[in-house]
Regions:
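Arg/Lys-rich, positively charged N-terminal/basic patches that mediate binding to nucleic acids
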Residues: 1-27
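Tryptophan-centered motif/residue detector
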Residues: 10, 28, 42, 73-75
Length: 89
């Protein structure tokens, strides 16, 4: 599976605390090696669009659009911001 990131994702990631950035890198490596790893809780989060989320930590999530064998990650942030994003989709 191929992962890509948007500029907005990279900017949001850069603005997160260092420990969360470290957790995000760890989650990415895990996703790269095994996208179905239970700790990632990788799942579809929209009923009609191919939008998926992955768990970074108990408090942070990443969200991406899935097409073919590629995920384009466009959001990374707190669970509260994640919940707001999902309501807006």
């Amino acid at each position: 599976m191929i992962s890509r990131t948007t500029r907005r994702f990279r900017e949001a990631l850069a603005g997160l605390p260092q420990d969360v950035r470290r957790q995000a890198r760890s989650a990415y490596r895990l996703f790269r090696d095994n996208p179905r790893h239970p700790s990632l809780q990788f799942k579809r989060v929209h009923p009609s669009l191919p939008i998926y989320s992955a768990r970074i930590s108990g408090d942070y999530r990443a969200v991406g659009s899935f097409s073919g064998d590629t995920v384009v990650w466009f959001f990374v942030g707190s669970h509260a911001d994640y919940d707001r994003l999902l309501r807006a989709l």
